[in-house]
Amino acid sequence: MSEQDSKWKFLIIADETPEFMKVLRLASKRAEKVGGSILLLHIIPPADFQHWTSVKDIMEEEAMEEAREQVAIHAHEIKRISGLDAETVIRKGKSEDVISEIIAEDHDIHLLVLGAEVDGDPGPLISSFREVLLNVLHMPVLVVPGNMTDEEIDKFA
């Protein structure tokens, strides 16, 4: 097995939840420490709008542009924290389908890192993981509580 084959790749899913920045920090620090890499995935949910194709196309293009901007911001933050250049992917679809596809396509992914809100509903990705992904993914999952401080994350990583 070559050194490249043994690198750990951490999959993180960009979203607008407050706990995502905790996920980004932990994955960045840990990947830096173990000589790994990060795959930053942004998922654009399927458009619900079906009346006029041209309006749907405009909405999808706006969503794609916003996703590109967010991914660039997050990739810059990963670089700032760890010095690593994240691999970035933007896909359209249902989150559980896209995550399953990415993991099936990229055999270098060793760990899925998700964030969870600690008060009430743990968040859409954790709920989806629990209901769907747990049955099809055969890899470790690290869940980062949204109430961890940066100091706690740095100590853990």
Annotate each language-model stretch with its function.
Residues 1-2, 80-112, 157:
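Structural beta-alpha unit
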Residues 2-54, 136:
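Small/aliphatic-rich secondary-structure junction motif
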Residues 23, 50-53, 100-101, 124-125, ...:
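Short, well-ordered secondary-structure micro-motifs
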Residues 28, 76, 101, 131:
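Active-site phosphate/pyrophosphate- and oxyanion-stabilizing loops and adjacent acidic/basic residues
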Residues 39-41, 87-91, 142-144:
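General small-molecule cofactor/ligand-binding pocket signal
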Residues 42-69, 151-157:
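Acidic, proline/glycine-rich short linear motifs
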Residues 59-87:
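Helix-adjacent hinge/juxtasegments
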Residues 105-157:
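Gly/Ser-rich helix-loop-strand patches that form or flank binding pockets
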